[in-house]
Amino acid sequence: MKVVISEPAKEDLYNISEYLAERSPAAARKLMKKFRDKFYLLATFPMLGRERNDIVIGMRCLVIDSYLIFYQPHDTEVEIWHVRHSAQDSSNLLSDI
């Protein structure tokens, strides 16, 4: 199964990386590697995260450190919708999808 990263999720990852890199480039690289590793894991185990049907039917959420990966598994791919810090409000998650 392949992993598809949506444009909003790409923006999220870019913003996270830029924010962390200002403080610690090494920490930013380490976290981005964790995200990549988790995306590869989702390609093999797409049902790994917790169901978040309260957001969208079929939506799942996986935690990495203090970040939440919101994704939806499909028959042939896993679509990453957003990556948010756990302190961020997720109520507007669908506003730009």
Annotate each predicted stretch with a short phrase.
Residues 2-59:
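Basic, Lys/Arg-enriched alpha-helical interface segments
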Residues 58-61, 69:
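A beta-hairpin/wing motif
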Residues 22-25, 61, 81-83, 90:
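Short, low-complexity, polar/charged sequence segments that are solvent-exposed and flexible
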Residues 67, 72-97:
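Enriched for short, Lys/Arg-rich terminal
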